[in-house]
Amino acid sequence: MAVIKTKIVLDADVIILFAKGGLLSLLPRIFPEYEYIVLDIVYKEVKQPILNQLNNQIKFFQNIREVTFGDTIEQKREFARLTDVMGLGRGESACMVFCRYNHDVIGSSNLRDIVAYCEKHEIVYLTTIDFLFYGIQRKVITKDQANEFITIVNSMGSRVPQVDFDTYICSKI
């Protein structure tokens, strides 16, 4: 009998940041007890050259899986409400709805758009900093690598906060 793992549903922002920072291949090693997925809607948001890195994870390493979003009418309605009525992005909306109805974890750094919905529906979410924190705790990366990652992605125009990983606390998982 196959073990069904809880999924970490990656939003485009986390994929893009980890690809820019050179750590996309290590991301699935941070929580190996979870299955990492990218929804087809999110996959379509990822552009080259990052798409090449994502495809390598999906096709060659097989540690991230692409999944089609919207199995039920209920999910499709909620997605339409979030995108059309609330004006949220398609990727974030798909991830939140998927996690709500499947009891999975969202990986997103778009806190402005996800926090209220996730808290209302008791959806666990992990940010880029949370992944880095747990990566350090689980000895997948070092503090120096995490800090270098932040410096690199910020030099490319991203806005990842500098944190002190010795005092940072994350108790989401």
Language model regions located:
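Acidic, PIN/NYN-like endoribonuclease modules and their adjacent C-terminal/linker elements
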Residues: 114-173
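Short active-site loop/helix that positions an aromatic residue
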Residues: 18-26, 115-121
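PIN/NYN-family metal-dependent endoribonuclease catalytic core
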Residues: 5-10, 20-22, 26-71, 129-133
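Acidic, metal-associated active-site segment
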Residues: 89-105, 113, 134, 149
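Histidine- and aromatic-rich ligand-binding microenvironments
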Residues: 11, 38-40, 88-89, 107-111, ...
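Acidic catalytic patch
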Residues: 64-85
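Alpha-helix capping/helix-boundary segments
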Residues: 14, 42, 95, 113-114
